[in-house]
From Swiss-Prot:
Pfam families: Formyl_trans_C (PF02911), Formyl_trans_N (PF00551). HAMAP family: Formyl_trans. PANTHER family: METHIONYL-TRNA FORMYLTRANSFERASE, METHIONYL-TRNA FORMYLTRANSFERASE, MITOCHONDRIAL. Its EC number is 2.1.2.9. It is an enzyme of class 2 (transferase). It comes from the Bacteria. This is Methionyl-tRNA formyltransferase. It catalyses: L-methionyl-tRNA(fMet) + (6R)-10-formyltetrahydrofolate = N-formyl-L-methionyl-tRNA(fMet) + (6S)-5,6,7,8-tetrahydrofolate + H(+). Attaches a formyl group to the free amino group of methionyl-tRNA(fMet). The formyl group appears to play a dual role in the initiator identity of N-formylmethionyl-tRNA by promoting its recognition by IF2 and preventing the misappropriation of this tRNA by the elongation apparatus. GO terms for molecular function: methionyl-tRNA formyltransferase activity. NCBIfam families: fmt. GO terms for cellular component: cytosol. PROSITE patterns: GART.
Amino acid sequence: MAKISILFMGTPEFALPSLEILVRNGYPIAAVVTQPDRPKGRGKQLVAPPVKIAATSYQIPVLQPPGIKDPAFLEILEKISPDLIVVAAFGQILPKTVLDFPPLGCINVHPSLLPRYRGAAPINWTLIHGETRTGVTIMYMDEGLDTGDILLQEETPIPPEENFGILHDRLSNLGADLLLRAVRLLEAHQAPRNPQEDSLSSYAPMLKKEDGLIRWSEEVSTIANRIRGLSPAPGAYTFLNGKTLKIFAAAGIEQSVPGQPGEVGKLTDQGLQVTAGNGYVVLQDVQMENRKRMNVSDFLRGHKLSTGTVLG
């Protein structure tokens, strides 16, 4: 029996395992739709999205419409006529004309346990809020923001040492495995469909710069979770002598401490102690504005930072 034809829509690295698992398992990818190339770096050279690079290596046709409602794209969609559309971190909301097109519908790989953490940045906010469990949901797409019925869902614990980068990669691979199971169920016309419980929903909006600002009066666990939820990118930050200091790794020690919030204490084997609301945050990896990321011991060799200096 011939496998179903799939139109794949995705853009960043998160989507790569999902595309790759479909290709490896012999599913015909009619085309890949991804965001346009964007200028990056100091030279502002155009850089292709990771999914475009992967699709080109597989010799899959790539479409980069300026907008998903572009009439030219809709014409191509009619010509391609896929059985199923698979979406993984595409970056645009799909209109009803696209959602209604494929006979098997549109499904999305979402890195949270829906209905919790609907939105653009679920992995970041899951960590920032100190959750100990998360997962991946394969959902049928509708016109809402991650509100469609659930096809499959898998839960996984979050170890305390995992940051955004580690959890991102783990969920992208978990999502790919779950996607393959979902596609096979759809192919066999055995896919379940369970409505989300809207009363349990929460949102994970797109990150803003101020979401990375460390408030030293907060509890150490709150600060440590913000740091891990934004590491390695975009990075939680504070200020030192008017310049941005990004913090990528830190630990929290809850104890009664002297000094005001943000006050620099001593350097220990674990890192540099900074006073917070209910203890110390111990800085381990940092990056000064316009400098490279480094461990805090190397940083202190190049920056004179005396005890009593206040960050923020």
